[in-house]
């Protein structure tokens, strides 16, 4: 199966405020897209619409393949060790390459530490490992580089490149530069 993600003439409204309209995109296996724009312009709303977690005001989304999403809510139980918190999700998600993702993101030395003691960047890397371990065809990454140091950002870039090389699709929403040579979709505030 070839991954595919497209959106046709999307509009998003929050209350009486129109965040964006007329948004269309089409991504095939190996493609990536960087959605940019200032805070509050609708980047997260677009990601939630693409993931099927929110309905567009108008328009439609078509998807072939499985979707995994990373957002600001990492859903890691702070009362458990990182090992146990990740194991919980690995059982639910059916993660098949979780150990590989833990190693790739430098988490092996942190597995026995309670999540509440991890830094923001360490928690973000754990969330990325959880998401990548799902082996989904389409990755939706909402602000994936927030809180990451230069080495961790390079690790994430490597994971994204490997995912694309295997036919995966990646959509990154961020107001930060990604360091990746991929097309950009700039969302602008509606007037």
Q: Each PLM stretch: what is its role?
A:
Residues 51:
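Helix-to-loop junction immediately C-terminal to a conserved catalytic motif
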Residues 96-111:
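Conserved ABC ATPase "signature" region
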Residues 114-123:
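Conserved ABC ATPase signature
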Residues 139-143:
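Catalytic Walker B motif of ABC-type/P-loop ATPase nucleotide-binding domains
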Residues 128, 167:
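Hydrophobic anchor residue at the start of the ABC signature
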Residues 5-7, 19-22, 148:
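Conserved structural motif at the start of ABC-family nucleotide-binding domains
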Residues 73, 78-97:
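Q-loop/switch helix immediately C-terminal to the Walker
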